[in-house]
Amino acid sequence: MAVMDPWLLITIIVGFGMAWAIGANDAANSMSTAVGAKAITPKQAVLIAGVLEFTGAYFFGKSVTETIRKGILYPDRITDPTVLIYGSVAALLAATIWLVIATKFGLPVSTTHSIIGGIVGYGIVYAGFSIVNWGKMTQVVLSWILSPIIGAIMAFLVFKALTKSIFERKDPVRSSKIWSPFWIGLAFVVIGTMFYIKVLHGKSLKTGVLFYGIPAGLVVFLILFLTLRVKFPSSDPFIGVESIFRRVQVITSGYVALAHGANDVANAIGPVAAVYAVATMGMAGMKVPVPRWILAMGGLGIAIGVATYGYRVMETVGKKITELTNTRGFTIDFSAATVVLVASWLGLPISTTHVVVGAVIGVGLARGVKAINKDIVRDIIISWFVTVPVAALISAFLFKILMIVG
């Protein structure tokens, strides 16, 4: 299998490029609300995100990954290892090209949808439309529609409830001493549960809630409740409440970065692991082992992507859609995490990127339609709908060339 070695090197380079693009676009979402709400500076954001994305990818990334993401193609139709190699390179390169274009314009798009588009493109060229699992593709299309709508509704309702429980009371300071710990504690129930499922890859929601979520939520609630009874951050209730949520927002955003690294690194390393398995062991199955160095490569690529080019998407999500404060940023993080957790439990097709952007829109709508930058929202929605077809077309073209010259 020595003849495969050059293709392994090519795939590693392209996979690293894909990881970089994921960091520049998708990973930037994790810190966008914290930057937009001025909880942290852009420089602090890229440093925190870079470290946590790498940590999530290397230490918590799955040791076994799918060669064909989300079962989007029927694996029994691809028996030739060469096709898998050429297809992996074409899909990775196509997804990378599209992500770089989207990032250039500051458009947050789904990296999962990008790689799915790349896989569909080479699959159709190789074996026709019958190779595509159209049931799975229907789920992908549904996620375009469901994710932002559910995210927006959730954020709208949470923000309305939060403001009513604190800011609209006769004594906001007194109310915030009770309700701030409640909302933040509730958020940590979700974060603790998500840590078990998304980072530790646990299977039981009940175990996650009982042994991770509730203990984390109770500890945070008690610490905040007792602290605020001793000293409130400011005599001005609005400044005081925003100060409380500012500190929490750094933690919630950091968690999102950690979980993103653990999960979405597979979009970059899955095809690399597939080619590595073929080149070194002659394996060409649906699932393949992932060496630690490939996880490290993916994590490093994502971290560098956030640090060098993540500011464009951060600016769009954090500043251009609507004006954010710390309570609004917290609402977005909490709502997005809750929606993703429930969707994972129910098996619903959900895009985290779309949920986050939908939540930003929902928080803006809670203040009225005029609080939303409709031009930016329009551009983002268009970019979502063209992601799969554009990535598919680029991949089809590249795969055809590789099959001819390879």
Swiss-Prot record:
It holds the Pfam family PHO4. The chain crosses the membrane at residues 2-22, 45-65, 82-102, 115-135, 139-159, 182-202, 208-228, 288-308, 324-346, 385-405. It is a multi-pass membrane protein. InterPro entries: Phos_transporter (IPR001204). One of its GO terms (molecular function) is phosphate transmembrane transporter activity. GO terms for biological process: phosphate ion transmembrane transport. GO terms for cellular component: plasma membrane. Keywords: Cell membrane, Membrane, Phosphate transport, Transmembrane, Transmembrane helix, Transport. It is found in: Cell membrane. Potential transporter for phosphate. Belongs to the inorganic phosphate transporter (PiT) (TC 2.A.20) family. PANTHER family: PHOSPHATE TRANSPORTER. This is Putative phosphate permease TK2061. It comes from Thermococcus kodakarensis (strain ATCC BAA-918 / JCM 12380 / KOD1) (Pyrococcus kodakaraensis (strain KOD1)). The lineage of its organism: Archaea, Methanobacteriati, Methanobacteriota, Thermococci, Thermococcales.
